[in-house]
């Protein structure tokens, strides 16, 4: 009776193995769980361990293929049977060969027909632990690398809240005109040619509210052309042009004329009285100081950093 069961089982095994891919196990038959570190079958039968699960270690406790003096590719006969009548090697075979040599140490051979219930893997466990530690370490390294690279980029593009706090500020050649005191007047050269040039009045009178700190602090005294300048006292405005003729009954005004003082041709209609409360008094001129340069350079570097980082 036991011999018949064994022979019938061998005959069924040969039929299964003769089919193309009959003894191979699909990945859907095996359930992988990282928590339990085990491989659980979903249905009974001859379950084979897939190739991507098998570690490269020899089976230490009972290697049937090597004990019989046969290689892995040889067919193993069902001569050795356990007490229950099942052959001890029938738990795992791959298409006519013994796969017990590929199992890790510590795995007991399963009875026939039941498949492998549970594989307690020591080496796969350690391998998975090393993989998880490598993943965590690599992710941490990536995080540290990204933070370091971003801080390096910030330090290269923009160093400190202002330019003077930068360690490289002392190494830069500062122009000599920055050392001039604020109260000193700029040298103004009169234009070559006659004063009665073809420059309209409203072109000279274009002005705006001073925005830089030095212009606010110095007022209009620093500007080379202001109505306090004695060189401009004799200039008379007639028909939208400057003329050098001195007439005591005309006054020079530096205020911006309003639109109702212009005729159809765009020229002023007459003398314009200065409005003292106007914020546009005085001819506008750009006075560049060290504070202005640092302010604009700091603002430019902030914009450049925002553009590089994509936050603008």
UniProtKB/Swiss-Prot annotation:
It holds the Pfam family PNRC. GO terms for molecular function: mRNA phosphatase activator activity. Residues 68-77 have a biased composition (Basic and acidic residues). Residues 85-103 have a biased composition (Polar residues). Residues 1-26, 45-106 are annotated as: Disordered. GO terms for cellular component: cytosol; nucleus; RNA decapping complex. GO terms for biological process: mRNA methylguanosine-cap decapping. Residues 8-17 have a biased composition (Basic residues). This is Uncharacterized protein C18G6.09c. It comes from Schizosaccharomyces pombe (strain 972 / ATCC 24843) (Fission yeast). The lineage of its organism: Eukaryota, Fungi, Dikarya, Ascomycota, Taphrinomycotina.
């Amino acid at each position: 009776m036991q011999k018949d069961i064994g022979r019938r089982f061998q005959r069924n095994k040969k039929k299964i193995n003769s089919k193309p891919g009959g003894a191979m196990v699909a990945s859907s038959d095996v359930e992988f769980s990282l928590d339990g570190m085990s491989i659980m079958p979903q249905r009974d039968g001859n379950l084979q361990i897939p190739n991507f699960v098998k570690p490269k270690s020899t089976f230490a406790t009972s290697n049937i293929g090597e004990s019989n003096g046969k290689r892995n590719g040889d067919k193993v006969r069902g001569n050795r049977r356990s007490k229950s009548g099942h052959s001890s090697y029938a738990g795992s075979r791959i298409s006519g060969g013994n796969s017990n040599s590929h199992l890790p140490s510590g795995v007991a051979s399963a009875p026939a027909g039941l498949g492998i219930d549970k594989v307690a893997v020591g080496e796969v466990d350690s391998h998975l632990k090393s993989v998880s530690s490598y993943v965590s370490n690599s992710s941490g390294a990536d995080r540290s690398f990204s933070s370091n690279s971003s801080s390096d980029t910030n330090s290269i593009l923009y160093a400190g809240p202002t330019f003077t706090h930068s360690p490289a500020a002392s190494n830069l050649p500062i122009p000599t005109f920055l050392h001039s005191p604020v109260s000193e007047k700029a040298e103004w050269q009169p234009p070559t040619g006659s004063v009665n040039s073809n420059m309209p009045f409203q072109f000279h009178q274009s002005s705006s509210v001073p925005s830089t700190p030095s212009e606010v602090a110095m007022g209009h005294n620093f500007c080379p052309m202001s109505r306090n300048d004695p060189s401009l006292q004799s200039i008379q405005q007639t028909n939208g042009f400057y003329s050098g003729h001195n007439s005591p009954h005309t006054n020079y005004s530096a205020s911006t004329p309003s639109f109702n003082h212009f005729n159809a041709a765009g020229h002023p209609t007459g003398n314009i009285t200065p409005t003292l409360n106007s914020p546009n008094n005085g001819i506008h001129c750009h006075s560049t100081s060290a504070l202005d340069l640092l302010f604009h350079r700091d603002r430019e570097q902030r914009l450049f950093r925002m553009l590089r980082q994509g936050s603008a």
